[in-house]
């Protein structure tokens, strides 16, 4: 069994942030000193800010990541960005399979899997997102759906050092709604069982994040749950004070 898994608090800025927003990032970097002793911190800004964000965070305790990548390293893919480009700009992580990508862009598990493989090819850590819809949860299919997404989206060869899995129930993202603590624990147990079944000891050490209306008010309760090794934060990551408060709540 692995020792205590070091938590990761990751901020997904989504399609938010101009150059002026780097001030919030600087505030996160300034406030990260003590928190970093026990928690890893990551901000995933829009692609336009990755290079200046990474440059600004040199020497700090805050990593920078991308929000998506193309499966190919280069080519005629207008508007897309490759994992190699993200790495070249200073990113060390990339989110793949976020529900907004799956829903708005029709990304399948196979597409997400290819993107995770691309992340590894470029030396990035892949944050693979999974989660059920409200209808799927109401039908009692949440565990089944998440298990299927894991099987299809996480490539073979996953290791604790190159994979993070984020559970984000689709119905909780940006709605203010949150599953019960029992619901979160049950799905995180399903994820852990899936990963250890496939990857043995490596699967035991993969960090499992919870995302979906995670905020300072509920962070301590959620982050203390079994198999919850951090959070993927949306709106609350846009303000340094909120992001750092969530990080401080890690046990």
Swiss-Prot record:
Q: What GO biological process, any one, is recorded here?
A: glycerol catabolic process
> EC class of this enzyme?
isomerase
Cell cycle keyword on record: no
Under catalytic activity, the entry for this protein gives:
D-glyceraldehyde 3-phosphate = dihydroxyacetone phosphate
| Binding-site list for substrate | 12-14, 174, 213, 234-235
Where mainly located? cytoplasm
Associated pathway: Carbohydrate biosynthesis; gluconeogenesis; Carbohydrate degradation; glycolysis; D-glyceraldehyde 3-phosphate from glycerone phosphate: step 1/1
Q: Does the keyword Secreted apply?
A: no
**Keyword annotations from UniProtKB, A to Z:** Cytoplasm, Gluconeogenesis, Glycolysis, Isomerase
Q: Return the EC number.
A: 5.3.1.1
Cross-referenced Gene3D superfamilies: Aldolase class I
Q: Where in the cell is it found?
A: Cytoplasm
Q: Which SUPFAM superfamilies match?
A: Triosephosphate isomerase (TIM)
Q: Name one Pfam family in it.
A: TIM
What Gene Ontology cellular-component terms does the record carry?
cytosol
Taxonomically, the superkingdom here is Bacteria
- Recorded GO MF terms: triose-phosphate isomerase activity
What is the similarity comment for this entry?
Answer: Belongs to the triosephosphate isomerase family.
Q: How does it assemble?
A: Homodimer.
Q: Which NCBIfam families match?
A: tim (TIGR00419)
Official protein name in the record: Triosephosphate isomerase
Naturally occurring in which organism (per UniProt) = Afipia carboxidovorans (strain ATCC 49405 / DSM 1227 / KCTC 32145 / OM5) (Oligotropha carboxidovorans)
Q: Which gene encodes it?
A: tpiA
């Amino acid at each position: 069994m692995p020792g205590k898994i070091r938590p990761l608090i990751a901020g997904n800025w989504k399609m938010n942030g101009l150059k002026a927003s780097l001030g919030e990032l600087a505030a996160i970097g300034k406030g990260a000193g003590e928190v970093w002793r026990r928690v890893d911190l990551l901000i995933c800004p829009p692609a336009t800010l990755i290079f200046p964000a990474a440059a600004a965070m040199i020497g700090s305790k805050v990593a920078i990541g991308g929000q998506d990548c193309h499966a190919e390293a280069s080519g005629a893919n207008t508007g897309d960005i490759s994992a190699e480009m993200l790495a070249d700009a200073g990113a060390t992580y990339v989110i793949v399979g976020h529900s907004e990508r799956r829903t708005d862009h029709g990304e399948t598990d196979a597409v997400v899997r290819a993107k995770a493989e691309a992340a590894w090819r470029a030396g990035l850590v892949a944050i693979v997102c999974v989660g059920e819809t409200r209808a799927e949860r109401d039908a009692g299919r949440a565990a089944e759906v998440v298990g299927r997404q894991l099987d299809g989206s996480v490539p073979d060869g996953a290791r604790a050092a190159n994979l993070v899995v984020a559970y984000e129930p689709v119905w909780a993202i940006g709605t203010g709604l949150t599953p019960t603590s029992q619901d979160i624990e049950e799905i995180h147990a399903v994820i852990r069982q899936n990963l250890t079944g496939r990857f043995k000891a490596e699967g035991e050490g993969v960090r499992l994040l919870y995302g979906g209306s995670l905020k300072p008010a509920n962070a301590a309760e959620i982050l203390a749950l079994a198999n919850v090794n951090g959070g993927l934060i949306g709106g609350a990551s846009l303000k340094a004070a909120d992001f750092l408060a969530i990080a401080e709540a890690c046990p």
